Every structure is written in C-alpha cells, then in structure tokens.
Design a protein with these regions (language model features):
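Glycine-rich oxoanion-binding loops at beta->alpha junctions
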Residues: 1
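Conserved thiamine diphosphate
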Residues: 4-129, 133
Length: 134
C-alpha cells in the first residue's frame, strides 16, 4: 500500500505506539522505507516510560536508537505541542523518511516565544548559562 501511494505522487503518514512502530516493525521500516529512502512519515505515540495504564510492555526508549541508526532517517522528538505542530509541518515538507516521536502525557509549553522557529536538525537555546549543558 505504501508503494501504491508513493507511485501516485502521494506519501503516507503512518502512526502507531512507539513500541510497535520502531520495535515490532523495525526490519520493515529499515528495509522498505529507510534503505530506499522513501518519503514516508512515521508518527510514534506513547514514547518513553510514561504510558499510564498500558504498562511496561508498551514502554519504549530504544526507538530512538533504532530509528537513528537507519541511514537517511530523520528523527524528531518534539518538546511540547507547539513544537509538535511545527515538526509535523517540517516533516511534510522534508523529502525522505521521518520518525516523529510523541509522548502520551501533556507537557508544559516551552516554545511560546514569538521568534520561535522550528528547523529539522537545529536545537533551541531556552536560556544562556555557564553551569549546565543539555
């Protein structure tokens, strides 16, 4: 189905829990999307360890490592809903595979500045300092 969409000049946005999008489907993502550098976007929800009542079987940290090692795969882990919206638009505009990683729980908004602009591969300086680097 993905190939049918691509050959008709459309591209799929697919979504699943991170545990399944990256874990269970890793070989298919690597071989069928990553290696041929297809224009497919993967939205992975419930990433991390805060998945609520879904429990340990649905917790996923290794998705970052799995997706980052695929050549050409862009991995985006938005920090809040403002960045998540901007990241989806950036993924749409990017030609090639993208893995968008979303948590389950609500998080505080930190990207509410008027000059905020999301760019793939660039970080945001929230506050200058000398004591800690993150």
């Amino acid at each position: 189905m993905i190939y049918n969409l691509l050959f008709n000049y459309q591209f799929p946005f697919i979504s699943s829990f991170a545990m399944f999008a990256a874990g269970r489907n890793y070989e298919q993502v690597r071989n069928s999307i990553g290696y041929p550098h297809l224009n497919v976007k993967i939205g992975a929800t419930h990433a991390g360890i805060s998945v609520g009542e879904d429990g340990a079987t649905h917790q996923c940290l290794e998705d970052l490592a799995l997706m980052r090692e695929i050549p050409g795969m862009v991995v985006i882990n938005p920090s809040d809903d403002v960045e998540a919206r901007a990241a989806v638009h950036a993924a749409y505009d990017h030609v090639g595979p993208v893995y968008l990683r979303f948590g389950r729980l609500a998080v505080p908004v930190i990207n509410d500045r008027e000059d905020y602009k999301f760019e793939i591969g660039k970080g945001i300086v929230l506050r200058e300092g000398k004591d800690v680097t993150i």
